[in-house]
Amino acid sequence: MSARSIHIVDTTLRDGSHAVSHQFTAEQIAAIAGGLDAAGVEYIEVSHGDGLAGSSYNYGWAALGDEEMLKAASAAIKKGKLTVLLLPGIGTVEDLKMAADCGAKVVRVATHVTEADIGEQHIGMAKKLGMMAVGFLMMCHMAPPEKVVEQAKLFESYGADYINIADSAGAMLPEDVKARVGAVVEAVKVPVGFHAHNNLTMATANALAAVEAGATFLDGACRGLGAGAGNAQTEALVGVLDKLGYRTGVDFYKVMDVAEDIVEPIMHRPQVVRNAPLMLGYAGVYSSFLLHTYRAAEKFNLDPRDILVELGRRRMVGGQEDMIVDVAYQLAQKRGGN
C-alpha cells in the first residue's frame, strides 16, 4: 500500500461549464469554489469550458465574462489555488495577465497533442507573472507514446511545472493510459498528471491507471460534470484513492456534500453515458463537441451518432467546432440525394 500524495485538480467550474452551456452564475461559482476550498481541494479550475476568452459564437457564449468568473471564485478561495485554462489561439497573454490580476495562481496551457510549440509564449509569460504553468496535451489518444513524450519534453523545456496528459475524447482504455503516462513519467523530470473523460465509462479506471504509471496530479469534477459524459468524479476519486492508501488532503465527506448539495441541483441533466457520449469515446471525438453535435443533428434532422462517426473519421480536433455544422450539412445533402 502506497502513502504517495496525489494532487487533486477540480475542473467542475471549467470542464463542467460545457455541461451547463457555460451558464454558471457568480453565486454558483462562489458557492462551488468556496465549498471545494473548504473541503481541501488544492487546485480549483475556473474558466469558460474552452478556456480564457472562450466565450464566443463558435464555442458558446458564457453568462459571465472571464473577469467576473475569476473574481467570484477568487473571493471564495482562501487556501486553494485558483487555476485557469488557456488554449493558445483562443486565449492570449493579455487574458493571462488579467487572470493573474484576478488572483489566478496556476495556468494550464492546453494544446493539441502534436502542437506543444504554440504554448511556449504562454508558458513563458506565466512564469514571468509568478504563476505555476502546466503543459496540457489534449486528445492524447491520437498520438503514440513516443509522440506524446516528444511534446511533453517541449513543454518541459519551456518551463512547465508539470505535464498533463488529457484523454479529451474519453477514448482511451487503461493500457493506453499506462503506455502514454508511463512513457512521459520516464522521460521528464517534472510531475505528470492525467485528465479523464467518461465516454466509455473508464474515467476512474483510467485515472487509477495513470497513478499506477506514476502520475501525481489527477483531474476530477464534482458529479463528473464535464463535456461529453463528463470527467472522473472528484468525490469518487477521493474515496477510491483513500481506499488505496493515497493521500489527497481532501475531506471525503465535505467534497461529497459539495457534489450533492451544490453541484447536483444546478446540473441540466444527469451526467450519464448516453448513446452520443458513448459514440464520442468510441469514435475518438473531442468531448466538448457533444452539445454542438446535438444542435446540428436537430437542425438537419440527423442521428447525432452519424455526425460523430464522420467527425471521428475526419480526425477533427478541438477548435474545429465550426466544422460540425459543415459535416452535418454534407450528411444531410448526401441523404437527400440518395
Curated annotation (Swiss-Prot):
Positions that bind substrate: 14-15, 168, 195, 286
Gene Ontology biological-process annotations: catabolic process; L-leucine biosynthetic process
InterPro entries: 2-IPM_HCS-like, 4OH_2_O-val_aldolase, Aldolase_TIM, DmpG_comm, DRE_TIM_HOA, PYR_CT
Highest taxon of source: Bacteria
GO molecular function: 2-isopropylmalate synthase activity; 4-hydroxy-2-oxovalerate aldolase activity; manganese ion binding
Enzyme Commission number, as recorded: 4.1.3.39
Positions contributing to Mn(2+) binding: 15, 195, 197
Residue ranges occupied by any Pyruvate carboxyltransferase domain in the UniProt entry: 6-256
Reaction catalyzed: (S)-4-hydroxy-2-oxopentanoate = acetaldehyde + pyruvate
Pfam assignment, any one: DmpG_comm
Coiled coil: none
Site-annotated residues for Transition state stabilizer: 14
UniProtKB keywords: Aromatic hydrocarbons catabolism, Lyase, Manganese, Metal-binding
Residues at the catalytic site: 18
UniProt similarity note: Belongs to the 4-hydroxy-2-oxovalerate aldolase family.
Alphabetical list of NCBIfam families matching this protein: 4OH_2_O_val_ald, PRK08195.1
Protein name: 4-hydroxy-2-oxovalerate aldolase
Origin species: Moorella thermoacetica (strain ATCC 39073 / JCM 9320)
